[in-house]
Amino acid sequence: MNMKKTGASLQEARLKRNLTRQELGSALSVPEQVIADWEYGLACPELTELKHMAVLFGCSITDLAGDSSGPDGLPADFCDLAVSPLLFGDNLEHTRGCVNGGISAEILRNRKFVGKPGRYGCAHEWYSMAEKRHFAPDTANEYLYFGAPYTRHAEGYRMHRSHECNAQYITNYGGIAGMGQKDLYFRAGTEYRFTAAVKASAETVLTVSLLGSDGSVYDSKTVTAHTGDYSEESLVLTSVREDWEGRLEITFDTAATVMIGAVSLMPCDHFHGMRKDVIARMKELGIRLLRWPGGNFAGEYNWKDGLLPRNMRAPLQSYLWLETQPHTDGYDFHEISTDDFVALCREIGAEPFITLNPTWNTPEESAQWVEYCNWDGNTVYGRRRAENGHPEP
């Protein structure tokens, strides 16, 4: 692109529409000086800015560029070689703030209690209620007594990093005990689906509450933790007003030990566990090709974990700890499975581009992933896909 010719074309188009540089800058959300630099040939607008101006002026991008010739002065239509629309794409890195705090509809932090518990026995990002005993089992003997955590890895997981599969245990000797999380954003009038994998040493009624920053109760309902194995209990809570510093609290007054394997809180209007407003913006971008799960994170990912129910999938501790620490405290919570990713691509009109994990997955396991995605229901993993609600590849 010849910046001088482009600048002259931009100025001509602007003057034809009786726009000042300030007015054009306001329409493009750029300073007036930027418009002047373009017109003097000192700088070049981005393609998105050219596209915006072409719509504004009612012309083509080629008209604004002021030069219809290609390299070496050849006409632009001289080369009839078709270029694949999949030559360029975007990357959905399943780590850091891209999913957790990004496209994921989950609003709770550390919802599977990873890492070492804090000083008072509560997992990081959670606070304890009352002077009771909060702890997370940390030895084989404790797990023998209290049972294994709810979260787990699927077959073929070889990394075995630290404190990925934890649970939060609360022992109450009388009175009220529980745990909570603060600094949550609630939308006014929005319904939130709360789900928890729980069990208890004696049948225990848990009170689940949404609270405002001033301590007022927006909504409160109960679920029951039963003895025996974990069960997922669910209810819907509604926030009566917008609050940027809301709280979720889980409390009980039974003399018992309650074991919480995972918790979830997300708006009921999500799409496969993802935010609809973010997906709408992705549609606007016109993404043609979307890569997932990484990037660097491809070397962390065990695809078969995604075959487990979402709340049961073990978090993944990242070897790129310094990259993930500011976002998710060094862990990823595996919110998106292969099925979810493909559904997202179909929703936004993008071609899915899946990256394998040659570091920890064998060639056979990678081939099984290809089989899961592309083969019919007459194969082992084709049947698994069909059982998950997707009979067609």
Question: What residues fall within each predicted segment?
Answer:
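Alpha-helical residues within the helix-turn-helix
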Residues: L15, S26, V55
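DNA major-groove recognition helix of helix-turn-helix/homeodomain DNA-binding modules
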Residues: T48-D63
